[in-house]
Amino acid sequence: MKWNIQFDQDNGFLRAYQSGNFTSADQASFLSDIFSSQFWQTGLPLMIDYCHLDVDNIRYGDILSSSEFLTALNGSLGPGKIALLCDDDVQFGIGRQFQMIALIHLDREIAVFHSGRAAIGWLTGQHLAARTAQV
């Protein structure tokens, strides 16, 4: 599995890309690298882009361990939002499972999106659902 972490200066969020074949060990390293990157600040909005990640071998135990690993980093996260970008239905379903498990213990909102534009809008408060929720 490969990954890249970039700061989107125009929109003020961190974007982490993954590609290749999923492994739980790589996922833990990926999450660690996000929160130890030069760009990370507590409370920074985060988009995790799974569009180029092969998820065919992911099982429930992998989702659970990834969620537990993220929960252990809760103190580094701070309040804010995490958008999961998943461009196919299998990725989206796995993302929703991860969301439901992680939300139990995280102090952050998590949402899953098919569209990068919708994910960015939600992260930056420009998405219709974000505006409606603030009313």
Q: Model-found features: residue ranges?
A:
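Amphipathic, Lys/Arg-enriched alpha-helical "gate/interface" segment within cytosolic domains
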Residues: 1-135
